From Swiss-Prot:
It holds the Pfam family TMEM164. Disulfide bonds: none annotated. It is a multi-pass membrane protein. It is found in: Membrane. Coiled coil: none annotated. The gene is TMEM164. This is Transmembrane protein 164. The keyword Transmembrane applies. One of its GO terms (biological process) is positive regulation of ferroptosis. Positive regulator of ferroptosis. It comes from Bos taurus (Bovine).
């Protein structure tokens, strides 16, 4: 009985992953890189990731001590405390409901297609087949990845961003991302032969396709995620004036009473 339950669990986890599709996984995908190269890349990237985390934490802890002694801290001047902070708002609750529903539908699709293991992917790579509306959910979820951070940063409070010139929170985030990929995702991918976020072999459309695709992708993602994060902060600064402009634009003129 226990063995049957274990087999059922594994079937739910990755039984629906079809290795016949290029980039999904399988023995050939798992053997794309030699174990020597895979080990070397893992040691180098994990070491750099830990260094990023430790260096950033050192600066963050030092800044925290300075703030405790009355320092100005790293809060940007243009972000101020809002009087409505701490109060529930309709827009925030609606956004929370939309995000929960989207994630719930995504989890349901993963169980229905027996690809639950893909929930471990930072960006859910799905086959977009078998069930209706899965393609739409894919894009809705990724649009929410933009809407939610910008909205929370615009609201301020605990979600106040760091200054554009500071990278003390961007560094540990990048380090944790690579540590997660080269430890948890890679180990699970090798055990299950499922290509989780392309840690076993490159996608067929990968611009860095080749034996060193992970090294090229690591450098590219470091640059792009940090640049992208700063752009999100800029958009959060613009969200307030833009929303006010759109509301004024859509507001109907008051009816004149004689």
């Amino acid at each position: 009985m226990s063995r049957y339950s274990y087999q059922s669990l594994l079937d739910w986890l990755y039984g629906g992953v079809d290795p016949s599709f290029a980039g999904n996984g399988g023995p050939d995908c798992a053997a794309f890189l030699s174990w020597q190269q895979r080990l070397l890349e893992s040691v180098v990237v994990l070491t750099l990731a830990l260094l990023e985390i430790l260096v950033a934490l050192r600066h963050i802890l030092r800044q925290t001590k300075e703030d405790g002694r009355g320092g100005r801290g790293c809060q940007p001047e243009q972000v101020t405390q809002r009087p409505e902070e701490g109060k529930e708002s309709l827009s925030k609750n609606l956004l929370l409901v939309a995000l929960c529903l989207t994630f719930g539908v995504e989890v349901g699709f993963k169980f229905a297609t027996k690809t639950v293991i893909y929930l471990l992917n930072p960006c859910h790579l799905v086959t977009m087949m078998h069930l209706p509306f899965e393609l739409e959910i894919y894009y809705i979820q990724h649009v929410m990845l933009y809407v939610v951070p910008i909205y929370l940063l615009w609201k301020g409070g605990a979600y106040t961003p760091e200054p554009l010139s500071s990278f003390r929170w961007a560094l540990p985030s990048t380090g944790l991302m690579f540590f997660y990929h080269f430890s948890i995702l890679q180990i699970l991918g090798l055990v299950t032969e499922v290509n989780l976020n392309n840690m076993l072999c490159p996608a067929i459309s990968d611009p860095f396709y080749g034996p060193w695709y992970r090294i090229w992708a690591s450098g590219h993602q470091t640059l792009m995620t940090m640049t992208h994060g700063k752009l999100v902060i800029l958009f959060s600064y613009m969200a307030g004036p833009l929303c006010k402009y759109l509301l004024d634009l859509l507001r109907l003129p008051a009816k004149k009473i004689d």
